[in-house]
């Protein structure tokens, strides 16, 4: 039986900055610029922060590898991480997306993206995205990948995943009967 994530109310900005710090070494080594944007005042997420950081690091490293593989010129070697609140089918979620300026995903790769042990890389075990998706889904989230187009040309790729705001996270501070705030 797979162990459940060790969930705690977690600050999104802290998770992102820790993931960025971990991924930045690899990105610098590949001469890839990283920019990131985290929306202000995001609520805490009830997640296992280590696991979510692991997903973010994996996506950023994959993005850098894709750019390297595409042999992009220095000016076009960038990865962008964006974290924003969204409404999806009436559900409040926080969406994390990693965009790269690599060569995108071929249709046959797109189909097999999350298969265990499927990899387009010479090195690597092919457990990365499969594990990422498992982690996201264990948090009741979803993950998706899409190519980014400029006209008919693929100019990169976007991997995104979202994590729902649970009722517990929305009520971290709830007024008790006296009207004073209580921390859950």
Predicted regions mapped to residue ranges:
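Conserved micro-motifs of the catalytic ATP-binding
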Residues: 1-5, 44-47, 120
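A conserved beta-strand-to-alpha-helix junction within the catalytic ATP-binding
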Residues: 8-20
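Conserved catalytic submotifs in the C-terminal HATPase_c
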Residues: 28, 33-43
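A residue-level detector for a conserved hydrophobic packing site
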Residues: 52-53
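ATP-lid-like helix-loop hinge signature
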Residues: 64-92, 148-153
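Short conserved segment of the HATPase_c
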Residues: 105-117
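Detector for a conserved hydrophobic position within an alpha-helical segment of the HATPase_c
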Residues: 136-137
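Glycine-rich ATP-binding loops of the HATPase_c
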Residues: 140-150
């Amino acid at each position: 039986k797979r162990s459940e994530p060790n969930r705690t109310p977690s600050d999104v900005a802290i998770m992102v900055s820790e993931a960025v710090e971990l991924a930045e070494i690899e990105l610098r080594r590949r001469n890839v610029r990283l920019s990131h944007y985290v929306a202000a005042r995001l609520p805490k997420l009830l997640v296992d922060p280590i696991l979510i950081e692991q997903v973010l690091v994996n996506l950023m490293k994959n993005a850098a590898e894709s750019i390297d593989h595409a042999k992009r010129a220095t000016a076009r070697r960038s990865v962008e991480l964006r974290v924003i609140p969204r409404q999806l089918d009436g559900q409040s979620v926080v969406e994390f997306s990693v965009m790269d300026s690599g060569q995108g995903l071929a249709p046959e790769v797109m189909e097999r993206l999350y298969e265990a042990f499927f990899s387009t890389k010479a090195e690597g075990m092919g457990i990365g995205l499969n594990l990422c998706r498992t982690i996201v889904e264990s948090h009741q989230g979803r993950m998706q990948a899409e190519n980014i187009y400029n006209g008919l040309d693929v100019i990169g790729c976007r991997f995104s995943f979202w994590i729902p705001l649970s009722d517990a996270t929305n009520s971290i501070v709830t007024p008790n009967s006296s009207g004073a705030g209580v921390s859950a």
